[in-house]
Every structure is written in C-alpha cells, then in structure tokens.
Amino acid sequence: MKVLIIGANGQIGTQLVDKLKDSKHEPVPMVRKEEDLNTFKEKETEPVLADLEEDISHAFEGVDAVVFTAGSGADTGKDKTEAVDKKGAVKAINEAKSKGIDRFVMVSAFGADFEPKEWPDSMKHYYEAKAAADNHLISSGLNYTILKPGRLTDDSGNGKVDIGERTQERMGEIPREDVATTIREILDRPNTYQASYEMLEGDQPIAQAVERI
C-alpha cells in the first residue's frame, strides 16, 4: 500500500517513514520545504513537496492511504494551530475523499474528545482544533482510525501499549516510536476502521494489542 505521510518531518512522521520502508507498505513523505526533499530521497523514498496551508491536491495522486501526523504543537498560537491542526487536517480529509482514498489514519491528542470544561485554558485552542478535525473525519465516510496518544516522549519505544476506546489510566505518556509502530500495525487492519483509540505506554505488545481491539 502506498501511504502518504503528512507531517513526515515531525518526530512521529520521520520514524513512520523508516518503519514503513521496512514493511510491505511504501511511504510517500510530504514535506513543505525543498531542502527537505533530499533528506527523504536519501532514505530511498519519493517525497512530495506540498504545504498544508496551500494547494495539496497533487500530493494525493496515486496513493492508497493517508496518515496525518502534522501538528503545530500545543505551544503555538491560535492562528497557526487553526491553520494546521484544524483547516489543514480538514483539507487533507476532503482531498482524500475526492481522490477516492478511503483509508485515513489521524494522530490526534489524548483528551480531544473530553468535555471542553476539562481542557486547560492555555491549551483550549489546541484541543478545539483537534476535536474539530476528528469530528470531520468521523463524518467523512472514510475508513478512518483516530489515535489519541498521551504525552509524547522521545524515549525509545518498548513495543508495548495500553490502547482502547478508553485506556486504563486517565493520562500518561507514550514514546513517539511506539505511536509510529502502532500506525504501521493498524494501516491495513479492518478491525480498526471507523474507530478512535486512546493510547498510552502499557504492557501489551503492539501487534497483539492491535489484533484484540
């Protein structure tokens, strides 16, 4: 399966490119700066140049699935968050639908589906954007999976997670590497279609956890 990775320059996206290269899937990294093209060409992939805040239609040609890992970050201002996390995501969802690409994986945020009163004031704009994008994907008719990881860390992944509609703990951490591994595992698993999952580090091997959800 040819997989467009939106946000390939991010820490999850970069690791996902490497993991898909070593699988049966073919990653197509989407980058917004020309100087980043060579980085991914050196990885023996065929990157595509596109900016979420501009036209991205060409990036979707010939792909079978889309993974949205882009994000402005919780510390950015409201305008940038709105442009990337909400409008950029909605644009990608609409483009996938128009191109007949029915598999879409969204990396969202733990808590995006909580009641707004539970969101910290300093991050309210971030959660609002994530929630709006998730809801648009849910209503799109695509074969979606929404992953809502807890606090992301740069620790090496241990290959074990707590994943489900609701995790056992109400908040926690997870290495970015384990998020990337989980995306690789769920890409072509129909049992994860039309579903949203919280995910934290846990004690269940990822492949086994994905098979059981």
Label the predicted regions.
Residues 1-25:
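N-terminal Rossmann NAD(P)H-binding glycine-rich loop of SDR-like oxidoreductase domains
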Residues 2, 64-65, 103:
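Structural motif
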Residues 6, 26-30, 34, 76, ...:
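Conserved Rossmann-fold NAD(P)-dependent oxidoreductase catalytic core, especially the SDR/UDP-sugar
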Residues 12, 66, 147, 179-183, ...:
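Non-catalytic, hydrophobic alpha-helical segments
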Residues 29-98, 187-191, 197:
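NAD(P)H-binding glycine-rich loop region in Rossmannoid oxidoreductase-like domains
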Residues 31, 148-153:
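Conserved SDR Rossmann-fold cofactor-binding beta-strand/turn motif
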Residues 70, 105-108, 150:
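Active-site beta-alpha turn of Rossmann-fold NAD(P)-dependent dehydrogenases/reductases
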Residues 154-157, 161-213:
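Active-site-lining helix/loop region of Rossmann-like oxidoreductase modules
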